[in-house]
Swiss-Prot record:
Single GO biological process annotation from the record: DNA transposition
Gene: xerA
Domain Tyr recombinase: start-end pairs: 122-306
Protein name: Tyrosine recombinase XerA
Gene3D superfamilies: 1.10.150.130, Intergrase catalytic core
Keywords for the protein's UniProt record, in alphabetical order: Cytoplasm, DNA integration, DNA recombination, DNA-binding
Subcellular location: Cytoplasm
Alphabetized GO MF terms: DNA binding; tyrosine-based site-specific recombinase activity
Record domain Core-binding (CB): where: 21-107
Active-site residues, as the UniProt record annotates them: R169, K193, H258, R261, H284, Y293
Protein purpose: Site-specific tyrosine recombinase, which acts by catalyzing the cutting and rejoining of the recombining DNA molecules.
Sequence similarity: Belongs to the 'phage' integrase family. XerA subfamily.
CDD domains listed in its UniProt record: INT_XerDC_C
Length: 311
């Protein structure tokens, strides 16, 4: 009996990691757990991609018979991402954290000694106030075009105004429903990441654009932003739209929805808005995240420095 148990134990030890664990099933269980914990759909999608990519890498490894070999395979994977895929340091950090969390959830102890590398804290880019105005004014809304053309132009101008004046994420923008908006109070209820709702504001000009857009809509839908066929817009569509208007406005910088969001935060900070108020408007759970987004731009830094008159 003892010999049989020893033989069974030795047989299990000779099995590789992928034979001992059903990875596809573990991945599915992990994603269900993330959904139960109210992780956002985008976060779950990212985690799924990271874990599945690592699993596919492991399938080509043939020496996963103990923790040391599994650890070595993980390090080879990180090396592969850096050398061959040329990914950023921040992505390496994310991969390390996600894979470690997945292994911990699955009861696999191979990566306990792995430490996530430090993230880089590069300053996010932003547009200045004149560039934002040029971008929005690149959308020419005229009454001499077709009904569909006027609808599209009015919609596009409203999208640019909302992204900047409210600091929305593009995923939040395309998910907006008409009943989320209170034009009289100039507020929007955002269904944020992880089911964390928040209220954001918009200005008088954006309200006027909103009311004009609602009059010009040619399809009925609970969603605010629609294409010409009446379907909700996708994040990719909005990204390409902004890129086209930036080119038309002659802006040489890269312009994305996220850069408009950062410009919103940066300009509020420059105008004296308290950073905790900005944190609330952006929907950040940690103040440190807001501090990275709202790093003082170089021109403001120069102005403060010059006013100091050190010599």
């Amino acid at each position: 009996m003892v010999d049989t148990m020893n033989m069974k134990r030795e047989s299990e030890e000779r099995q590789g990691l992928l034979e001992r664990y059903n990875f596809p099933e573990l991945i599915e269980d992990y994603l269900i757990e993330l959904e139960i914990r109210n992780y956002s759909p985008n976060t779950i999608k990212t985690y799924k991609s990271i874990v599945k990519n690592f699993y596919e890498f492991l399938m080509n490894e043939d020496d996963l018979y103990d923790d040391r070999r599994v650890l070595r395979s993980f390090k080879r994977y990180i090396q592969y991402l850096k050398r061959d895929k040329k990914v950023t340091q921040n992505y390496i950090y994310l991969v390390t954290v996600v894979v470690k969390k997945f292994f911990e959830f699955s009861g696999i102890d191979c990566l306990e000694e792995v430490k996530a590398p430090k993230r880089t804290k590069s300053l996010p880019k932003s547009l200045n106030e004149d560039e934002v105005k040029s971008l929005i004014n690149a959308v020419e809304v005229a009454d001499d075009g077709s009904v569909i053309r006027r609808f599209i132009k009015t919609r596009d101008r409203l999208i640019l105004s909302l992204l900047y004046s409210s600091g929305l994420r593009v995923s939040e923008l395309v998910s907006l429903r008409i009943n989320d908006i209170d034009p009289d109070e100039r507020t929007i209820r955002i269904r944020g990441k992880g089911d964390k709702d928040r209220i954001v504001l918009f200005d008088e000009n954006t309200r006027d654009l909103l009311m004009d857009y609602l009059k010009r809509r040619i399809h009925e839908s609970e969603y605010l932003f629609l294409n010409r066929f009446g379907d909700p817009l996708t994040p990719r569509y909005v990204q390409m739209m902004i890129k086209n208007y930036a080119r038309k406005a002659g802006i040489k910088k890269k312009v994305t929805p996220h850069i408009l969001r950062h410009s919103f935060a940066t300009h509020l900070l420059k105008n004296g808005v308290d950073i905790r108020a900005i944190q609330q408007l952006l929907g950040h759970s940690n103040l440190s995240t807001t501090q990275i987004y709202t790093s003082v731009d170089m021109q403001t830094l120069k102005n403060v420095y010059d006013r100091a008159r050190l010599l």
